[in-house]
């Protein structure tokens, strides 16, 4: 067994203060015949923020999409290995991927509000999925949880697309919250935002982790160090055909990752020697 595999397995059995919400065991991801991500072993602790960092093309977003089977929507994508969500193998043929995505919501890199009113951005999906409660209360609660209610409460009929970029991203977070998820996946949620909006989203994440597990892909190492409880460092390696493929190198508490990483690769990346 390689050092990398041993290190991953050691990381996967770390005693988190919270139980694992996801167990990743030997996951590989292919795009067509290309092996894009190799042999990942990882435990995701509940009600904490986990950051995925690493250079472009290292598999961060590829793994993130595995957690709610968004890779199913990519032609030719194939996932091998076991990925358990609260003791259920989510790649079992009996798992309903649509229901899974209600429990494991996703916020994308660029804000993508529906071309509808602010109110309908929140109410549309719950209504379409048979929500029987009070929609007005759900809309207000979701917007409050996303720390945007006070900014939009007097213009709920206005288009969501008319909001600023930072407001749109918080609206998208509110939209995800409205589906009552267990986990929130965030794929570089601040990459298109200005510093003030970025700070607002980071502060929101710190509040939301009291109720949700948050897994965040970020190219901003300072962001990872500010908000994450745990950090996973990914890197690339050259395969036998000269192509780069992604791998998980190290998974550690964030303070340890940024002060005394276990691997030379992580140390060199964090110190700015590459990436």
Swiss-Prot record:
One of its GO terms (cellular component) is plasma membrane. Keywords: ATP-binding, Cell inner membrane, Cell membrane, Membrane, Nucleotide-binding, Phosphate transport, Translocase, Transport. ATP binds at residues 54-61. Signal peptide: none annotated. Residues 22-261 form the ABC transporter domain. The keyword Chaperone does not apply. One of its GO terms (biological process) is phosphate ion transmembrane transport. It is found in: Cell inner membrane. One of its GO terms (molecular function) is ATP hydrolysis activity. Disulfide bonds: none annotated. InterPro entries: AAA+_ATPase, ABC_transporter-like_ATP-bd, ABC_transporter-like_CS, P-loop_NTPase, PstB-like. The keyword DNA-binding does not apply. It comes from the Bacteria. Its EC number is 7.3.2.1. It catalyses: phosphate(out) + ATP + H2O = ADP + 2 phosphate(in) + H(+). PROSITE patterns: ABC_TRANSPORTER_1 (PS00211), ABC_TRANSPORTER_2 (PS50893), PSTB (PS51238). It is a peripheral membrane protein. The complex is composed of two ATP-binding proteins (PstB), two transmembrane proteins (PstC and PstA) and a solute-binding protein (PstS). Belongs to the ABC transporter superfamily. Phosphate importer (TC 3.A.1.7) family. Part of the ABC transporter complex PstSACB involved in phosphate import. Responsible for energy coupling to the transport system. This is Phosphate import ATP-binding protein PstB 1.
């Amino acid at each position: 067994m390689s050092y990398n595999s041993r290190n991953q397995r050691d990381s996967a059995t770390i005693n988190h203060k919270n139980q694992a919400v996801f167990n990743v065991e030997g996951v590989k991801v292919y795009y067509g015949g290309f092996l894009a991500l190799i042999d990942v072993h990882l435990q995701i602790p509940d009600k904490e923020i986990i950051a995925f960092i690493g250079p472009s093309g290292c598999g961060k977003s590829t793994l993130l999409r595995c957690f709610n089977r968004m890779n199913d929507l990519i032609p030719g994508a194939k996932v091998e290995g076991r990925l358990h969500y609260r003791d259920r193998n989510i790649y079992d043929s009996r798992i309903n991927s649509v229901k899974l995505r209600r429990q494991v919501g996703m916020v994308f890199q660029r804000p993508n509000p529906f071309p509808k009113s602010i109110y309908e951005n929140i109410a549309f999906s719950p209504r379409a999925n048979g929500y029987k409660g009070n929609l007005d209360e759900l809309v207000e609660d979701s917007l409050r949880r996303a720390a945007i209610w006070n900014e939009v409460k007097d213009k709920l009929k206005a288009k969501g697309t008319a909001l600023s970029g930072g407001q749109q991203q918080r609206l998208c977070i509110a939209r995800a919250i409205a589906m009552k998820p267990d986990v929130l996946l965030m794929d570089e949620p601040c990459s298109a935002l200005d510093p003030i909006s970025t700070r607002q989203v980071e502060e929101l994440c710190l509040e939301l982790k009291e109720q949700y597990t948050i897994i965040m892909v970020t190219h901003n190492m300072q962001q990872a160090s500010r908000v994450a409880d745990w950090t996973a460092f990914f890197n690339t390696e050259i395969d036998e055909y000269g192509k780069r493929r992604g791998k998980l190198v190290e998974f550690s508490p964030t303070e340890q990752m940024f002060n005394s990483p276990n691997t030379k690769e992580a140390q060199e990346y964090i110190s700015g020697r590459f990436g």
